[in-house]
Amino acid sequence: MRQKEGIYMTHFYIIRHGETVFNRKGRIQGWCDSPLTDLGVSQAKQLGKELKNVPFDVCFCSTSERAIDTANSILEGRNVKIIPSKNLKEQSFGDFEAEKSVDIFKDGVRFPDGYRFCGGENHSDVIERVTKELKKSHPNIRMRMF
């Protein structure tokens, strides 16, 4: 948290993990894990260089290997605590986890807003879960996620 003119300002940087093996293979990943590719590691290290002058107090990330590896690559050489939380994981796609995207979304199939994947979550579930986690660490935050 940074203080500016008597007001505490909290800045959030929302960063997506680098490319994963499943990204490259066109497979759906939410809660299932897939390691970063060499390109994914390189992407994270490059972002770390671009953010080198940005002061971070703490890093919250999902418990997925790809998120933790991305955070470690970005923050390499910096004394920033990384706090993994399962509540910051991506959307669970349930039975569709690790399936090929082209098989699920063939012929332009689109799922309606609010659709809950069998054994998984819908967008509202994710927003509620992530919001609850962020409010736990920042109780006075005023936040809206859409």
Whereabouts are the PLM-identified features?
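Short glycine/proline- and acidic residue-enriched helix-loop micro-motifs
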Residues: 106-125
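Active-site-adjacent alpha-helix immediately C-terminal to a catalytic or transition-state-stabilizing loop
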Residues: 21-22, 68-69, 78, 132-146
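Short coil/turn segments at beta-strand junctions that form active-site/ligand-binding loops
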Residues: 10, 55-57, 141-146
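Phosphate-coordination/substrate-recognition cap region in phosphate-metabolizing enzymes
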Residues: 46-109
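Short, Lys/Arg-enriched N-terminal segments with co-localized hydrophobic residues
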Residues: 1-8
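A short acidic, helix-capping loop that chelates divalent metal ions and anchors anionic groups
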Residues: 23-24, 91-96, 113-117
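Short, hydrophobic/glycine-enriched beta-strand segments
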Residues: 11-17
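Loop-to-helix element that buttresses phosphate recognition and phosphoryl-transfer chemistry
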Residues: 19-68, 119-131
